[in-house]
Amino acid sequence: MQRASVTAAIILGSLCSAGLGAWALDVADVTREWTPEGKKTAAERAKLPAHDDMVRIPAGTFLMGSDKKVDRNAYPAEFPQRKVYLDAFDIDKYEVTTVQFLKFVLATNRNPLIDWQYDGGNFQETMASHPVMHVSWFDAEAYCQWAGKRLPTSAEWEKAARGEDGRIYPWGNEPAGLSRANFGRTGLSGPVRDRPERLLLYPPIISVDKYENAVSPYGVFQMAGNVAEWTADWYDPHYYKKAPDRNPKGPEKGTQRAFRGGAWVDSTPSVRPAQRNGTDPQTKMNWLGFRCARDVKDQAEATTTQQTNLQ
């Protein structure tokens, strides 16, 4: 699947008139500065509760990729489906939230994100539990390292999302619906990013702890929809044809970084965990966030799923 590009002029002309500001615009080249009052407000908001839980994904094999006979929405980049072995690892139970990223920004003296309206006092408390967006791959990697973690590999992300049995969605093979995932309305033809006015028909991002009825087999939330998620890998649509069957880490080099999970603007095929895509690692979009992973030091004891916590 190719993600369509649109000019900033078209997007800003359509969205600013609707009061939507930077929605659906790549803001990689846009920066903001803290104001004294804004930074003071940010420091107060940083005290809000964070979602720091992690989930243990046990060592073992899982079905990675798709079988066209089972999933008619599968793309060629998902072939061939095969068994892959992964060592045990921990992964964030939830997407990294705005308030978690705010703590990092303040601790490392970074500029605020483009969608943070601190100066006008518009950073509502509800935003704290929303997934962070408008972050590049480099931002995501820096945050994970700061938190003592790392970005998950694409294979780790997929196993955490769909378990071992090759299911199409985190909850099984039943089609995605708005009661299970925050994604774009089906039935509308054409890429949303070519028609920015359609964003008015699409749901916004929501808190990372919603959809308890649609968690993955390991209890990981929102591995389908809300925001797509950066992974550690370089992206190559042909990688599966040559990838190792044990702890694959993606191509050794490339020009795009892989992301997974689909987003609130996407249609049903794009929110399947097997769906693969990539983009420039400098990209900062309102549909793209991340979560972190962590190595398990004692693999001998990592044979069962268990919840862990950073604190």
Residue ranges and their predicted role:
Residues 9-17:
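Bacterial N-terminal signal peptides
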Residues 286-302:
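Short, structured beta-strand segments at or near domain termini in extracellular proteins/domains
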Residues 25-48:
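N-terminal pre-domain segments of enzymes
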Residues 52, 81, 86, 127, ...:
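Short coil/loop residues immediately preceding or within conserved phosphate-binding loops
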Residues 247-251, 277-284:
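Short proline/glycine-enriched turn/loop segments at secondary-structure junctions
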